[in-house]
Amino acid sequence: MIAKTVAVLALAGSAAAYAPTMSLSANRRELVQGAAAAAVVAPLLRPTGASARDAQLRAPIVEIFDARGCDAKNAQYTGPKSNDMNDDQCVKVSMQKITVSEATAAKKLQEFIGGKATAINVPIISSMTKKY
């Protein structure tokens, strides 16, 4: 994006350096040249989309292990011990693929669009509107 901005500023600077300062009126040739320059620069000024999406549809998963008072062997952490209560606690962060079944996606879509599937004891407000 910075390179595009620099290119546009360089183009504008070069056009300003060679602009005829003595003539006050623009003729047809100058208008066509200006339109051509604008047509070249216009695609460079388009905003680019965000590219933060993970290609494999993975998301960070945070797992907290608290084994204080538990007699089981702690196998999640393999680093050096601190010889206090932190030896029985561990936080694990991993990137895992997130999958959703097509049936669940269809149910959610129906819920968002038409209010068909809702939770238990939740009134459906889409059918409560008065029809005049």
Swiss-Prot record:
Membrane topology: Peripheral membrane protein
Binding site for (2R,3E)-phycocyanobilin 1: D54
Main location: plastid
Subcellular location: Plastid, Chloroplast thylakoid membrane
Residues annotated to bind mesobiliverdin: C70, Q76, Y77, K92
Post-translational modification: Contains two phycocyanobilin chromophores, one mesobiliverdin chromophore and one 15,16-dihydrobiliverdin chromophore with binding mediated by both the alpha and beta subunits.
Taxonomic superkingdom: Eukaryota
GO cellular component, one term: chloroplast thylakoid membrane
Binding site for (2R,3E)-phycocyanobilin 2: R68
Keywords for the protein's UniProt record, in alphabetical order: Bile pigment, Chloroplast, Chromophore, Electron transport, Membrane, Photosynthesis, Plastid, Thylakoid, Transport
InterPro entries: Globular_prot_asu/bsu, Phycoerythr-like_a_sf, Phycoerythr_a, TAT_signal
GO biological process, one term: photosynthesis
Family (UniProt): Belongs to the phycoerythrin family.
Quaternary structure, from the entry: Heterotetramer of 2 different alpha chains and 2 identical beta chains which form 2 alpha-beta heterodimers within the heterotetramer.
Note: The light-harvesting system in Cryptophytes contains phycobiliprotein complexes. Unusually they are composed of either phycoerythrin (CPE) or phycocyanin (CPC) but never allophycocyanin (APC), with only one type of biliprotein being present in any one species. Unlike cyanobacteria or red algae these proteins are not arranged into higher-order phycobilisome complexes, and they are found in the thylakoid lumen.
Purpose of the protein: Light-harvesting photosynthetic tetrapyrrole chromophore-protein from the phycobiliprotein complex.
Protein name: Phycocyanin PC645 alpha-1 subunit
Source species: Chroomonas sp. (strain CCMP270)
